[in-house]
Structures are given as C-alpha cells and as structure tokens.
UniProtKB/Swiss-Prot annotation:
Pfam families: FKBP_C, Trigger_C, Trigger_N. Consists of 3 domains; the N-terminus binds the ribosome, the middle domain has PPIase activity, while the C-terminus has intrinsic chaperone activity on its own. HAMAP family: Trigger_factor_Tig. It catalyses: [protein]-peptidylproline (omega=180) = [protein]-peptidylproline (omega=0). Its EC number is 5.2.1.8. This is Trigger factor. Residues 456-473 have a biased composition (Basic and acidic residues). Belongs to the FKBP-type PPIase family. Tig subfamily. Residues 171-256 form the PPIase FKBP-type domain. InterPro entries: PPIase_dom_sf (IPR046357), PPIase_FKBP_dom (IPR001179), Trig_fac (IPR005215), Trigger_fac_C (IPR008880), Trigger_fac_C_sf (IPR037041), Trigger_fac_ribosome-bd_bac (IPR008881), Trigger_fac_ribosome-bd_sf (IPR036611), Trigger_fact/SurA_dom_sf (IPR027304). The gene is tig. It is an enzyme of class 5 (isomerase). Disulfide bonds: none annotated.
Length: 473
C-alpha cells in the first residue's frame, strides 16, 4: 500500500492511496484461504474446498471486504504516521470510472482512492496570570427566607368547602369538568373531569379563570379564550377556543400558620430548623447563580485569549444545531425575523459567530483538560446517570438501560462533568475578587448561555442551555 499526501491547506489534508493489483490479489487469496476451514460447500469435504473454487463463488463479496479493510488500514496509517487529530471522520473518494473499479475488484488492475481529512488545530495554551475575575456573592436575607416560607405555606394552606350557594372568589379552589372545542370540534387534550383549579393562580389559559369567578356549584359556563401564540402545542397556538365548564365543588383557602407545627409538617424539628434549611437552599441557589456568572466571565476571558483556525465541519455542525433552535423558537412564538428587527441573513451571520465561539471554547477547554490530565471517573458518571434517572419517575429502568446501551448518550452525561472540572482548574489559574451583591444584582442579565456571551440584542433567542462541549477522553 502506497500513501502519498497530495494536498495540505489549513486544517484540510488529502492523501492518495494506491493498492497495486498484486497486493489486491495477495489480500484476496489470504482471505479466501482463511475461509477454507469454515465454509461448507456441497461436493467438498470440510477444509478441502479449493481456493480457486471459493474465489469463483465468493470472490466479489470477499474482495469488497478486502477493499474496506484496506481503507480502514490506510486511514489508521495516515493518522498514526502523521500524528493527526481528526475533527471529522475521513472522507474516502473512489474512482468514478466503473471499468477501472471492476478491474481492481477482479485484482487485474490497481486501485487508487483519495482520503480527505479535516484535522484539529494546533495551538499553545495562553498565560492566564493577568486575568482577574469578579465572583458575585449574595447571602440570603431574613426577608428572602420569610418570602420563601410564605410561598411554602401558600402551597400547603388548607381548603374547606364553601357553604351551599356560595359564589367562587379569586383564591378559591374550584373543581371542574370541561370540554373544549375549536371551530365546534373537540380537540386532543381539551377534556377534563374532576380537575382542581385555584382561581387567580394563572395555571390555565389567560382569561379562563377570570370567567369562573362568581360561579356556583352546579353552574355550567361557556368560557371563551384564545390560546397564546407561544403555546407549547403548535396545533393550538393562537387559536380561539370555547370550553363548556361545569363547577362541581368550591373550596375556600384557609390560613397556614408558619410555626413549629408547620415546620413539623415539612419534616423539620422546629421552625428554627426549617428556617435554617430554607436559608441553606436559597444559599445554594445563589451559589449556583454566582457560578454561572463567574463561568460566563471566565469563558469571555478565554475567548479573548485565543484566535486560531476552526475546523469547518465542527462549526457547521454547531451552527446547524443553533440555527435549528432559533427557527424553532421563532415558530413557537409565532414570530418572523422582521418582527425581531433583523433579517435571516443578518441573524445567520450573528449565530454563526456564536457557533464559532462555542467550537473555539470547546477546543480550548478540551486541550486544557488534556494538558492537566483531567479525568471523569466511572463513579462520577454513574452518579450523574442516577440523578438523570430520578428525573423520570416510573421509567427508571428504561432510562437506565437507554444510557447504558447508548455510548453517545453516556458521553453527553460525561461531557459537562469534564467541563466543570476544567473550569475549576482554570479558575485556579486566575485572580478572583469577591464582590458582595444583592439578590437582584446577582440574577440580573442571566439570559443567554455561557458559551455565547448572551443572546444577540433584538434577535430571536436561542433556547439552548447546553454549555461548551469539551471532550472528555
């Protein structure tokens, strides 16, 4: 096998591989000889089938395997001999002349094919000693703890049935049966029986709850609403609907006292212990928000430190994913690019920059992780898998089996674990300055994802919450 590099431009490399007819003949003969003891043909004793006869029966199919094995071998040799890291699977191009291919498959002519590669860029890791980042620190106040307790109490407050003939008021819980119709036809998901609804909670379609205020048990009301343009079910978004609603029960909300008894109902020893637990939970939320802000600032700093050629295939893949989210977002919200004060061409240019940033940061974090020998243990992946499984009650075994049988899905669990370890490592190389802030300041401007630097102003918002996909080896 003769391998010759015929083109090298940037991250693109191209090689020509030549398999001489004699080599094809030898490879085919070796494969057929190895089949003698395995093949049983009528008229021949086991292991006694002549190679010439095997060639007549299986020659073409075995030669196809020979060529495929040679292609795989050539790819490995090219990568190993040239010390390449591939960004894309090798693209193999065979001759277009069918007669030439036929001769090669009969081992009567040479076979030449091309292998096109796209390689990862080579770059030096930047010195981060001059980078200074601000970590925002917020501590839960007594008022924030009180607010959280009030919400908990509101969700736990008792309801008592109103007296006969009483009218439903805002804040009451009504039990209803309903049938919805659009253009006179019932629609999927538009029917319910014995459904509890707290009036004023905003849990139903806008305007639905308001039309039940003043209703009595046994009342039948025709509720007219319009589904929001952003409604999750696309076949209902923006549609006018009518619901025949029957009120079967009305309950008034009582008061839930925030005291030791309330704390015990929440599984805590006392109100003091409950306040401590709530404060700790809020503190964890604050710390997570602080981490997101700090990570965003770190990635911005890293992005400003690097400028190198990016593999076009990786950028194209990332852009396709980002753009699909943009289009889905516009469709869900019933908007156009004109509504967002832009054009499709301008939006594509801006989101391509986002894709490039993500790819660049992914490559940087991957190289940092490799340089620092950062690993993600199987135990850490298992813990992440267990956490994911718990998100699907009743389907735990199916979810577990899916991830265990799907290497790509498991890799997607491993990637963010690897990334967070790399981020921790990089944070250890920069100067951190803590700045006490309020809750409002901590959570301000949290739109956009960490790798993009936020959504472009006045553009359709990309909903992707995934972070830079640094690759874990």
């Amino acid at each position: 096998m003769q391998v010759t590099e015929i083109n090298a431009q940037g991250l693109k490399r191209e090689f020509q591989v030549l398999l001489a007819a004699q080599e094809l003949e030898e490879r085919l003969t070796n494969e057929l000889s190895g089949m003698k003891d395995k093949v049983q043909l009528k008229g021949f004793r086991p292991g006694k089938v002549p190679v010439a006869h095997l060639r007549k029966v299986y020659g073409r199919s075995v030669m196809a395997e020979v060529v495929q094995n040679a292609v795989n071998e050539a790819n490995r040799q090219i990568v190993t001999d040239n010390g390449l890291k591939l960004a894309l699977e090798p693209q193999v191009e065979f001759p277009t002349d069918q007669a030439e291919v036929e001769k090669a498959l009969d081992a009567k002519g040479d076979l030449a094919f091309k292998v096109a590669l796209e390689v990862m860029p080579s770059f030096e890791l930047a010195d981060l000693s001059d980078v200074s980042l601000t970590k925002l620190v917020a501590k839960p106040s007594d008022a924030e703890v009180d607010e959280a307790l009030d919400r908990m109490a509101g969700q736990s407050r008792p309801f008592t049935e109103r007296e006969e003939g009483a009218e439903a008021q805002s804040g009451d819980r009504v039990t209803i049966d309903f049938v919805g119709r659009i253009d006179g036809e019932e629609f999927q998901g538009g029917k319910g029986e014995g459904i509890d609804l707290e009036l004023g909670s905003g849990s139903f379609i806008p305007g639905f709850e308001d039309q039940l205020v003043g209703a009595k048990v046994g009342d039948k009301r025709l509720v007219k609403v319009t589904f929001p343009e952003s409604y999750g079910a696309e076949h209902l978004a923006g549609k006018d609907a009518e619901f025949d609603v029957t009120v079967t029960k009305i309950q008034a909300a009582g008061e839930a006292k925030i005291d030791d008894e309330f704390a015990k109902s929440m599984g805590m020893e006392s109100l003091e212990k409950l306040r401590e637990a709530v404060s700790e939970a809020i503190g964890r939320d604050f710390e997570a928000a602080s981490r997101r802000r700090l990570k965003k600032e770190l990635l911005d700093a890293l992005d400003g430190k690097y400028a190198f050629e990016l593999p076009p295939s990786l950028v194209a893949q990332e852009f396709a994913a980002v753009w699909a989210q943009v289009e889905q977002d516009l469709k869900t919200r019933g908007k156009t690019f004109e509504d967002e004060d832009t054009t499709e061409e301008k939006a594509q240019a801006e989101y391509r920059k986002i894709a490039e940033r993500r790819v660049r940061l992914g490559l940087v974090l991957a190289q940092v992780g490799e340089s620092a020998d950062i690993k993600v243990s199987d135990e850490e992946v298992n813990q992440a898998l267990i956490a994911r499984v718990r998100q699907f009650p009743g389907q735990e075994q199916q979810v577990w089996d899916f991830y265990r049988k799907n290497a790509q899905a498991l890799a997607e669990l491993r990637a963010p674990l690897f990334e967070e370890k790399v981020v921790d490592h990089v944070l250890g190389q920069v100067k951190l300055v803590e700045e006490p802030v309020s809750k409002e300041a901590l959570f301000a401007d949290e739109d956009g994802d960490d790798t993009t630097g936020g959504k472009p102003a006045d553009k359709a918002e990309a909903k992707d919450e995934s972070k830079t996909e640094a690759k874990a080896d």
